[in-house]
Design a protein with these regions (language model features):
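Accessory helical-bundle/CTD segments and flexible terminal tails appended to RecA-like ATPase motors
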Residues: 1, 125-181, 192-335
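Conserved interdomain linker/interface between the two RecA-like ATPase lobes of SF2 helicase motors
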Residues: 1-43
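Amphipathic alpha-helical transducer elements in NTP-driven molecular machines
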Residues: 6-14, 39, 48-51, 82-85, ...
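Hydrophobic/aromatic residues located in beta-strands of well-ordered beta-sheets
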Residues: 27, 115, 202-203
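Conserved helicase/translocase motor-coupling segment
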Residues: 29-99
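Short hydrophobic segments within beta-strands
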Residues: 30-32, 118, 205, 250
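Conserved RecA-like helicase motor-core motifs
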Residues: 52-53, 59-61, 112-123, 276-283
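Long, charge-rich boundary regions
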Residues: 72-162
């Protein structure tokens, strides 16, 4: 189902939820963001507050007191909710994105429906799943039928508690990750849910209904997806048609980071030319998250059909481990 750009819920979502609530059916909504909102943005200058230790937006949680607390999901540092912009001083602060808490809030406002939020940590073991099943059974015995909001799919479905409607709220969010395997991960995220969780009805809300990973997952076209994905990977020398190695360096001093990575890049290009390994692509790029726990990060990507042979030469000529580089010789992702 297509969601309009300025809408949180599509028309089909609203009709589906209303229909199943009236019928007393069990609804499961999957949203992969915790908390209340993804972050805040200044409408005067566009500034988005980031964690001081990590280059990610500060997420906000709604406390029982009604106040909001900022939290970095990586280092867990806490922040106060901004009243004015730290960059320009404007008070035009707006929130963006939606987490589990805001979804529960909107469902209550729009449908007068109660929700039960289940975080991913709640279902990491069979014992915790059994505890959750008991909680759901207790709600049922009290004639309560809340909408269940999950932050992750269960690898082992709850056999005793069958849902009538499963909704993927942001089915295309994984496609925003700049990685060669983003399409495959997005496909399997949907496909495996359709296979494992025997819901009578699924709703997939997306801004990209024609994207092949979403379209083919909804139609259960696994072989067709593989054909398209294999063609893409073969054309760009991505695994399994090419090899991929990442060499990561991190430092608290940004200048030192750039100097080290630039020097390594030049040394690798020199070795490539010296040993005439032409079927290689060597370039530098920052990871998806540039700074983590106060350290800046940068990496050298080596891609092609002769990566392993080249890395054997690199190890014999350069003392990378002693210089603080972290090497992933069989990388499955570039972020």
């Amino acid at each position: 189902m297509l969601r309009e750009e300025n809408q949180i819920f599509s028309e089909l979502f609203e009709k589906g939820v209303e229909k199943y609530l009236r019928a007393g059916k069990k609804i499961w909504i999957l949203i992969n963001k915790k908390g209340h909102t993804w972050g805040t943005i200044c409408h005067s200058c566009g500034h988005i507050p980031q964690c001081e230790n990590c280059s990610v937006a500060i997420n906000y949680y709604l406390l029982p007191s009604g106040q909001k607390m900022g939290l970095c999901h990586i280092c867990k540092r806490q922040y106060l909710y901004p009243q004015t912009c730290a960059q320009c001083g404007s008070s035009k602060i707006k929130e963006f994105g939606m987490g589990t808490q805001k979804l529960a809030q909107l469902l209550k406002e729009r449908f007068w429906a109660e929700s039960l939020i289940v975080e991913s940590e709640t279902v990491r073991s069979q014992k915790k799943i059994e505890k959750l099943t008991l909680e759901l059974d207790n709600l049922k015995s009290q004639s309560k039928n809340p909408i269940i909001i999950w932050t992750s799919l269960l690898t082992t479905p709850i056999k005793k508690w069958k849902f009538d409607l499963l909704i993927f709220l942001n089915a295309d969010i994984g496609l925003n990750i700049p990685d060669f395997n983003a399409n495959e991960k997005n496909f399997y995220f949907l496909y495996e849910a359709f296979v494992k969780h025997q819901c009578p009805t699924f709703l997939v809300q997306t801004m990209n209904p024609e994207h092949y990973s979403i379209r083919m997952a909804c139609k259960m076209q696994k072989s067709d997806f593989y054909a398209v994905e294999n063609e893409f990977r073969q054309a760009h020398n991505y695994p399994p048609y090419g090899e991929l190695c990442l060499i990561l360096y991190k430092d608290e001093i940004e200048e030192k980071l750039f100097t080290k990575v630039d020097q390594l890049h030049k040394e690798l290009l020199y070795l490539q030319e010296k040993y005439q390994l032409k079927d290689l692509e060597i370039y530098t790029t920052p990871p998806l998250i540039y700074k983590i726990f106060g350290k800046y990060r940068y990496q050298v990507v080596i891609k092609g059909k002769e990566v392993r042979n080249f890395m054997d030469i690199v190890f014999s000529k350069l003392q990378l481990h002693k210089k603080g580089f972290k090497i992933n010789r069989d990388a499955e992702s570039i972020v």
